[in-house]
């Protein structure tokens, strides 16, 4: 989004070059342009505005930039953009070495209204290898889930396969889920560690003390990032998900040197984007001002990152317990029920539009929605008027697996626009919520996760939420939003929500997918600032809305032991009309797809004849 300039579709493509290579030149060959018949009036990209308390001086400065942009383009008939293709940055995703290019296939002449379409664009990348590079320097990293992400990202993914070692070479140890926490957290974390292990994840809890003693860095944050950079490839641990556990100062977030006039955001995206060491990316000039405009950071996260933003052991244990319970709960009255809280941003921006767009998905045909909009102002029907007391009473009495609100925000709540302008949700809502039915929450508002304050996102994680995605500083919205291509916070909201509710993505994977999509499709106003402020997810990154059935093969009676009682249980089920294993698959000890007498025999051989262990 370039406010004031023609709103033309464009996309950033990631193109792989051989590992170790450095791009020396990028050029573009265009096929013949097609002049579309007629004349066109392409509107300018609108100016996003903050969805909180606006600083009038900052707004006037941004408005002046918008007007200058408009005059510079619409005041002449010069082609816009000047080039169909543009080099954006060097980048990386895990083992892959990438070059980002932006392609805008339409060229607009504002005064005459001519529009030229270029259907064929060839990208040429020249590269060279640095002195001393050898094939031994190539990272070994072959993880099926991450390869599927790479295939989504990389334009020439198939071509790149011949450049890397094949197979599933792994390190001496394998931990695809890493928890970074303060010492003495084993007991509070046990409910989540046990649950993730049952799901098939290989979990390792690593303390900040151990990292600090074994890795170098300017501060603890850099040491943690260096640890993750070292261990994430599959030739080491094969890390895919990272959960940070601790207050912002105990397990530090990274303060970023981006400021839209409302303060610098802290982010956990620093721990997700691991392509290069700090000295070559986040702090390239070594001035310890991370994330400056000059710092060459890319926007493809190597790992999914979430955080439990508490150090208190009792709170951590409670969040771990409800995280496991959330995924185990299969009641559709809960897991397919959404609460939609849509206020106006401005008079032309009713967030009921956003709410209705998000739930218009084929997989939601059997879901239940409870709507609260600004009645008397919104043209959309709702079940309740959007007011504080209504939200508190309805939410606390209901069962909602996903809650979405959109409205002007602060560190402590979100607000309606009309009548009183009151908060419809705030930190004082949380004590009333039923934590037996916590929700994944997307907060489309300013500052709801602002780490300089005791924010509502953190309060929700203590009571009411099992995941929370909000902005760590003042956020931007798009006026008149009615389509995901309009960008800003509403589009991030749309993409995160639709990914999570599809049941195909965990909240951590949905978070990174949505951030990546926003970047590659040019939907941000201030790319670094907004990627950073939306780069902190509260909660377990491996948590999803799909119900997870966990069981141990052979534990037919579900007593957490494999013994002769399981063989007897199976025989009673098969021949005495006894109860069935729950789930039935738990009785399939020999993993042949059937539950029959062979499974009871298999168990007896394992227990008394040194036969192979049950396994799924």
Feature map (PLM): residue ranges:
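Cellulosome-associated attachment modules in secreted, modular CAZymes
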Residues: 548-616
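Cysteine-dependent hydrolase recognition
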Residues: 1-548
């Amino acid at each position: 989004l370039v406010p004031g300039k023609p709103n033309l579709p464009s996309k950033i493509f990631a193109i792989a070059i051989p590992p170790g290579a450095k791009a020396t030149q990028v050029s573009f060959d265009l096929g013949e342009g097609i002049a579309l018949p007629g004349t066109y009036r392409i509107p300018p990209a609108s100016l996003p505005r903050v969805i909180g308390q606006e600083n009038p001086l900052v707004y006037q400065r941004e408005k002046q930039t918008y007007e200058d942009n408009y005059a510079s383009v619409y005041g002449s008939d010069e082609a816009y953009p000047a080039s169909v293709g543009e080099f954006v940055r060097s980048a990386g995703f895990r083992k892959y070495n990438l070059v980002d290019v932006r392609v805008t296939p339409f060229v607009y002449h504002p005064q005459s209204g001519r529009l030229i379409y270029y259907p064929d664009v060839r990208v040429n990348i020249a590269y060279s290898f640095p002195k001393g590079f050898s094939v031994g320097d190539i990272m070994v990293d072959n993880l099926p889930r991450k390869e599927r992400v790479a295939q989504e990202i990389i334009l020439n993914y198939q071509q790149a396969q011949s450049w890397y070692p094949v197979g599933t070479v792994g390190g001496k140890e394998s931990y695809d889920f890493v928890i970074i926490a303060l010492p003495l957290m084993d007991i509070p974390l046990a409910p989540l560690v046990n649950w993730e292990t049952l799901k098939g994840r290989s979990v390792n809890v690593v303390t900040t003390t151990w990292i600090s003693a074994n890795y170098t860095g300017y501060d603890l944050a850099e040491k943690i990032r260096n640890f993750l950079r070292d261990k994430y490839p599959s030739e080491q641990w094969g890390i895919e998900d990272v959960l940070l556990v601790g207050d912002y100062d105990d397990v530090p977030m990274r303060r970023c040197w981006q400021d839209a006039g409302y303060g610098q955001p802290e982010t956990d995206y620093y721990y997700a984007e691991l392509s290069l060491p700090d000295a070559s990316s986040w702090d390239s000039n070594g001035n310890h001002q991370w994330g400056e405009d000059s710092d060459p950071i890319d926007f493809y996260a190597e790992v999914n990152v979430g955080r439990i933003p508490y150090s208190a052991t009792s709170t951590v244990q409670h969040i771990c317990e409800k995280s496991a319970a959330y995924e185990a709960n299969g009641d559709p009255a809960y897991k397919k029920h959404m609460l939609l809280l849509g206020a106006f941003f401005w008079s032309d921006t009713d967030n009921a539009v956003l709410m209705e767009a998000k739930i218009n998905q084929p997989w939601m045909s059997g879901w239940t929605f409870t709507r609260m909009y600004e009645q008397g102002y919104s043209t959309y029907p709702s079940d309740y008027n959007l007011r504080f007391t209504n939200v508190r009473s309805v939410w606390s009495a209901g069962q909602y697996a996903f809650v979405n609100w959109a409205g002007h925000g602060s560190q402590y709540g979100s607000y309606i626009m009309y009548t009183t302008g009151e908060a419809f949700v705030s930190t004082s809502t949380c004590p009333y919520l039923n934590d037996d039915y916590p929700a994944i929450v997307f907060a489309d508002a300013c500052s709801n996760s602002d780490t300089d304050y005791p924010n509502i996102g953190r309060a929700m994680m203590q009571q009411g939420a099992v995941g929370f995605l909000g902005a760590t500083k003042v956020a931007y919205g798009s006026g008149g939003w009615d389509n995901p291509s309009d960008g800003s916070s509403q589009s991030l909201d749309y993409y995160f929500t639709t990914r999570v509710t599809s049941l195909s993505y965990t909240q951590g994977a949905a978070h990174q997918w949505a951030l990546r999509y926003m970047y590659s499709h040019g939907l941000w106003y201030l790319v670094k600032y907004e990627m950073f402020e939306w780069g902190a997810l509260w909660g377990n990154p491996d948590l999803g809305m799909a119900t997870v059935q966990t069981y141990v093969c052979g534990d037919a009676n579900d007593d957490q032991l494999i013994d002769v009682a399981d063989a007897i249980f199976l025989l009673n089920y098969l021949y005495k009309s006894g109860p069935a294993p729950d789930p039935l698959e738990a009785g399939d000890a020999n993993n042949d797809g059937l539950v029959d007498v062979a499974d009871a025999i298999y168990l007896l051989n394992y227990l008394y004849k040194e036969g192979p262990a049950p396994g799924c």
